[in-house]
Amino acid sequence: MTAARIVRDRIVEAVSTSGFGAHGLHVRIGAGEAEHRWTPDVLEDVHSVAKGVCVLAAAIAADEGAISFDVPVTVYVPDFERGEGVDEVTLRHLLTMSSGIDLPWSETLMTDWPDLAREFLRRPSRGRRFQYSNASTYTAMTALSARVGDVGDYLDARLFRPLGIDDVVWTRSPNGRIQAGGGLPLRTSEMARIGLLIRDRGWWQGTQLVSSGWIDAMHENGVVAGPNPGYDRYALAGWGGPGRGWRLHGAHGQLLIFLDDAVVTITAADHFGADEMAATVVDILETARRGA
């Protein structure tokens, strides 16, 4: 039995024991893969995993010379009103949640203002402080759209279609831009392809879709996010942990978990059980590595 199948079976057992509300599971270790379904593989919002997809969009644009991560984001939206300190905020700050701009989450965040990005940038920055917000990713993609046009169309051509992911329909804000920090419906199998691209440092079937350095930056040299394990470091959309692993983590249990040559994809409807499940997955991967 392959390592991927062993890990899959142990995760399935852990889900059964814990009662975690899993929908789908895909395990890739080396060239081996295995999957399991609890529910049909239908389109589901991957929530904040979409932030990682937005990082890939910005990375591809940077590879093409269309945008820079390290110049003030106001260069790309010069007509936007800006708060105190905002002229120092870069695309990298927005995508690492370290802009220092405070805009509290609400259920109606995307519709509370005519243009969320304008509202975000007109507020003051407190310097390089971690402040997790969908508005931060949305503002980054607003800046990107000023250089590449519609970000959804840009991703279709350069990421989704090369991965064999067709007919992607983002949830849109009232002004027509993708919601960016969420609102991306994918199947488990499609999310797993994005996970494999990331695991393989930007390569897909012999073609490099995004430079490896950007993939590394998704989980290396992150900013201090807080005191709690698993939420203490945040890089370009990637959370450090559990353990030696790192992950893209969407609400309600949408997970891409990376450890060495393994990537585990989980879709679910279980917000509060996700942290424990992520830790269990990493423990299972580490045990399998030891041959136990």
Give short role names for the model-derived ranges:
Residues 81-107, 119-121, 125-129, 133-138, ...:
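Conserved catalytic neighborhood of penicillin-recognizing serine enzymes
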Residues 45-70, 94, 140-144, 194:
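Active-site SXXK
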Residues 21-27, 32, 101-130, 150-168:
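Short, charged, amphipathic alpha-helices and their helix-cap/turn boundaries
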Residues 136-143, 182-203, 254-269:
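Active-site-proximal alpha-helical segments within enzyme catalytic domains
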Residues 167-169, 212-266, 271-274:
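Active-site Gly/Thr loop motif
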Residues 64-97, 146-182, 186:
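Active-site helix/loop module of the DD-peptidase/beta-lactamase fold
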Residues 276-292:
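Short, gly/Ser/Thr-rich active-site loops of penicillin-recognizing serine hydrolases
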Residues 2-41, 254-265:
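A short, well-structured edge-of-sheet supersecondary motif
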